[in-house]
Amino acid sequence: MINPEIFFDQLHEREFDFFVGVPDSLLKNLCACITSKSHQNNHIIAANEGNAIGIAAGIHLSTQTIPVVYMQNSGLGNCVNPLASLTHPDIYNIPMLMIIGWSQL
């Protein structure tokens, strides 16, 4: 298991400073770390995964930074359309780092 504090610090060193996502029980330690260590204005808990992608896209367009999006694997279906339309290289080409908790069913 990755230590969430070390992982967060590594992200921060690489200028990944904005976080948005839907909390996941598998990522609960990382979510707690993000909540405690990031600036209040740099962390948004989204209502659903598609919203998280949209918020991340808006952050990139307004700041030119690369946001971090976190979610559970069951939420991937909710973000297919925003991902396909906003991150596609021939459309808006918006980068984002995605962290997806993977439950083994």
Where are these regions (language model features)?
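Thiamine diphosphate
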Residues: 1-105
